[in-house]
Amino acid sequence: MQRVKDVVGELKARGHEAYKLHRTVARPWGAYTTLEEGPGFKIKRIEVKSTGSLSLQLHHRRSEHWVVVNGRARVTRGNDVFELEANQSTYIPIETMHRLENAGADPLVLIEVQCGDYLGEDDIVRFDDKYGRARAADTAT
């Protein structure tokens, strides 16, 4: 596994785009796949396991639009907590505390569209995380 990481790092360092081909990233709560990205936007498919929950977090430089494709989502946005089901959506403004949770037994699948001047995975401040990940500048959604 370390050898794969070394090869990916070398491709990235040399400016090759091939390192971007592996676009699915596993997380404790499920996984995300980057479907498309360009200047000022990134589109992800996010799948959250039953009982899975992303951290309570905010981003300084991007907003997010979420569209539920399958399952039931519990969304925390600022002081509001509400549920969404398939074909419903919500908007998370820049610097708004938020969390995504799977509120059902089936996998939660959604499409996330990020917009902003910086879309790196290190633009995250964590406030609460049931998996014990770091509070700030960690690499995950």
Placement of each model-derived feature along the sequence:
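Asparagine-centered strand-capping/turn motif at beta-strand->loop junctions
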Residues: 100-104
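Short acidic-glycine-tyrosine-enriched beta hairpin
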Residues: 78-97
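A short, N-terminal "cap"/entry segment at the start of jelly-roll beta-barrel domains
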Residues: 1-45, 49-55, 124-141
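A short hydrophobic beta-strand segment most commonly corresponding to one strand
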Residues: 1-6, 105-126
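A structural signal for the main folded, soluble domain(s) of proteins
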Residues: 35-36, 72, 91, 99
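Histidine-centered active-site/metal-ligand motif
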Residues: 57-60, 98
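Glycine- and acidic-residue-biased ligand/ion/polar-headgroup-sensing regions
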Residues: 59-79
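Structural motif
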Residues: 53, 65, 72-74, 97, ...
